[in-house]
Design a protein with these regions (language model features):
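Edge beta-strands of extracellular beta-sandwich domains
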Residues: 112-121
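The feature marks short-to-medium sequence segments in extracytoplasmic or secretory-pathway proteins
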Residues: 46, 55-80
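N-terminal signal peptide c-region/cleavage motif recognized by signal peptidases
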Residues: 17-20
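Short, surface-exposed binding/anchoring microloops in extracellular/periplasmic proteins
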Residues: 23-58
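A short, structured loop/turn motif at beta-sheet edges
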Residues: 34-38, 62-69, 93-99
Length: 123
């Protein structure tokens, strides 16, 4: 019986840890196509262990290096079977003095905290 209890403990620990480390949404790729009027279109690839409506990547955001939000792309449903996935957001106005932006992703359980990307803009 002790062996069964140990196996149960190991199995439940593994399940708990795997759910805990499903963790934050990561930005794995970003392309930015900017026009001369400081307006950019972004294609962002996000990876997250989506697990239905209770835990999924629900948005990504373009920010200045100082942390000011410039644009948010809401993700309206889980992508359980499509990982990583790419979504676009166009016509993002970039301040004239901004030459780099940070893109970060969020998930519905852990909020922000995963891998983010810094992107140099050619305007």
């Amino acid at each position: 019986m002790a062996v069964v209890n140990r196996l149960f403990l190991i199995a439940t620990s593994f399940v708990f840890l795997s759910q805990a480390f499903a963790g934050e949404a990561d930005v794995v790729d970003v392309t930015a196509n900017c026009r001369s009027n400081s307006v950019c279109d972004f294609n962002v690839t996000v990876r997250h262990a989506d697990d239905g409506w209770d835990h999924y990547a629900d948005r990504w955001e373009v920010m200045t290096l100082a942390g000011k939000s410039l644009a948010v792309r809401e993700l309206l449903h889980p992508h359980d079977d499509e990982q990583p996935f790419t979504r676009s957001l166009g016509d993002v106005k970039i301040p004239d003095d901004v030459t780099e932006v940070v893109v970060r992703a969020r998930d519905s359980r852990h909020q922000y905290g995963g891998i983010l990307k810094t992107v140099k803009l050619s305007k």
